[in-house]
Regions:
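A small-residue-enriched
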Residues: 62-163, 272, 276, 300-367, ...
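Regulatory alphaC helix of protein kinase catalytic domains
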Residues: 46-60
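Acidic, low-complexity, intrinsically disordered peripheral segments
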Residues: 40-44, 49, 104-106, 110, ...
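A short glycine-centered flexible hinge/capping loop motif at secondary-structure junctions
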Residues: 232-236, 429-433, 470
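Periplasmic alpha-helical coiled-coil/stalk elements that build and connect Gram-negative outer-membrane
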Residues: 55, 85, 184, 188-302, ...
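Sec/SRP-type N-terminal targeting helices
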Residues: 72-76, 89-90, 145-151, 162-190, ...
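Bacterial N-terminal signal peptides that target proteins for export
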Residues: 5-27
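Bacterial N-terminal signal peptides
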Residues: 27-35
Length: 497
């Protein structure tokens, strides 16, 4: 987008072929004046803001990975799910617990001796002893008995599930599948961050190129203005032509300032992505491979094997399968081994086996089973759609890469023609057969071609990054940067004098 704006601005700079061609002597003086003006422009000190941080592409990737809160949050979620799955690994083993109790008590009762007579009279019958006991008991008073104290006890108990019908294995599998889903989300977050970094990194590079070309166009317009002023003094052009040159210079300066502002904004956006406290200057240039990338089938295979979206869908299906297995397990008998022992000098203990089987429940378990089967079906259909969408995205990006490569290669002929025209214009100006304004026109058009070429290189880089992102291998772009057929477009590139 930035280069498109610059290209439009470049094309708006008028070049005036109708001006009168100067004599050879005047042409030489004009060339000297242009050189002095260009030198003065180059030596003019500019405002020095915060010193930018220079980062290559790999360094920017590493910083972005370290500084991204979103990626850190995804990693924390994945770690949490992993800890949950690890915690459930021992599910189904024995559980042992210890219990203890301390109690303070107070007991009180009233005893009536006369109440004991009926039980003893039955044994003695009508003997004189029985009559004597009855007479004695009637004279005894009742009395109160009270007792208080503290008692304590401890016990140890154990429970061991012997058979759960697969419910425990289903719970463990569900936790493992949730961990896989969280890992897929983390990988997807990392891939998205890599794609964002790639877009902002090379956007900043493109903006720097555009700013350089726009600044060069402003210097060319300055030469134009200086030449027009000299020609007006010599009386070879009209005042209106001089006014047009001044207007073109002001327009070029304004456009150069806007392009520089765009470049600074792109550098700030890149700095935010990598977590830097100052603007970032990218050092890895835009590039285009002169040879085609691997065949389309190669990227299809990579996407099917490594795309995190497919890994997440697979984890969702596994979750549905494990939930279905757990529900089915709960429909069968549950067998537990139990044991308990009192911890005393002469402990009491008990051990046994408990069996539980729910024959009827208020919950319709058949409907729940069908629901989990529908979840599995949904995951299968989602996987099929995701594979189709990913293949379409891969093919679209692969074709975009190849189209950008072809356009870039075709531009070499245009640049060669422009360079040849510049050579002829310079030679004509030295020999007095051409005008300085014709040379400026050729330089302006060549700068526009270089801008368009840089824009195509940016489109190629972004298409390649999109292809690798769709294939689940976003960091492989560094491998393509190292290929021997890579052609680099740097901000310092300028037309040959």
């Amino acid at each position: 987008m930035l280069v498109t704006r610059v290209a439009q601005r470049l094309s708006s700079t008028a070049v005036f072929e109708a001006m009168i061609r100067p004599t050879p002597a005047l042409a030489a003086s004009l060339l000297l004046g242009c050189a002095l003006a260009a030198t003065a422009a180059d030596l003019t000190p500019g405002a020095t803001a915060t010193t930018p941080l220079t980062l290559d592409y790999l360094g920017a990737l590493d910083r972005a990975q370290q500084q991204s809160p979103k990626l850190a949050a995804a990693r924390a979620a994945a770690d949490g799910r992993a800890l949950q799955a690890e915690a459930l690994r021992g599910l189904g083993g024995p559980s042992v617990s210890v219990g203890a109790a301390v109690a303070r008590y107070r007991l009180g009762t009233s005893i009536d001796p006369g109440a004991l007579l009926p039980s003893s009279s039955g044994l003695l019958g009508n003997s004189p002893l029985a009559a004597g006991l009855a007479s004695a008991a009637s004279r005894l008073p009742s009395f109160e008995v009270e007792q208080s104290g503290t008692r304590s006890g401890a016990s140890v108990s154990a429970v061991w599930p012997l058979y759960t019908g697969g419910a425990i294995q289903g719970a463990q599998g569900l936790a493992a599948a949730r961990r896989q889903e969280a890992e897929a989300d983390w990988l997807a977050a990392g891939d998205d961050l890599d794609a964002l970094l790639t877009e902002r990194y090379f956007s900043a590079q493109l903006a720097a190129i555009a700013a350089g070309l726009r600044a060069q166009a402003a210097r060319t317009a300055g030469e134009h203005d200086h030449a027009a002023a000299r020609m007006l003094q010599e009386g070879v052009i009209a005042p209106v032509d001089r006014l047009q040159a001044s207007t073109a210079l002001r327009d070029a300066q304004r456009q150069a300032s806007a392009a520089q502002s765009d470049a600074e904004l792109a550098a700030v956006a890149l700095a935010r992505t990598v977590g830097a406290g100052q603007p970032v200057r990218p050092s890895t240039p835009l590039f285009v491979l002169t040879q085609p990338v691997e065949p389309l089938a190669h990227f299809f295979d990579l996407a099917m094997a490594h795309h995190p979206g497919l890994a997440k869908v697979a984890a969702k299906r596994t979750q549905a399968e494990q939930l279905h297995a757990a529900q089915q397990g709960l429909r069968g008998p549950q067998v537990l081994a139990l044991a308990s022992s009192q911890l005393r000098d002469r402990p009491n203990w008990a051990a046994g086996v408990a069996v539980s089987w729910t024959l009827w429940s208020s919950i319709d378990r058949d409907q729940l089973s069908r629901a989990t089967l529908k979840d599995i079906e949904q995951a299968d259909l989602t996987d099929a759609q995701a594979r189709s969408d990913i293949q379409l995205l891969v093919e679209r990006q692969w074709r975009a890469v190849d189209n950008a490569r072809r356009q870039f290669m075709a531009f070499d002929a245009h640049l060669a023609e422009g360079d040849e025209l510049l050579r002829l214009r310079r030679a004509g100006l030295r020999e007095g057969t051409s005008t300085a304004l014709a040379l400026i026109d050729a330089e302006t058009r060549q700068a526009q071609r270089r801008t368009e070429r840089a824009q195509i290189a940016y489109q190629y880089t972004q298409a390649l990054a999109g292809l690798l992102h769709a294939s689940g291998q976003p960091r492989d772009i560094t491998r393509y940067l190292a290929r021997p057929d890579a052609v680099f477009i740097k901000p310092t590139d300028a037309p040959a004098p």
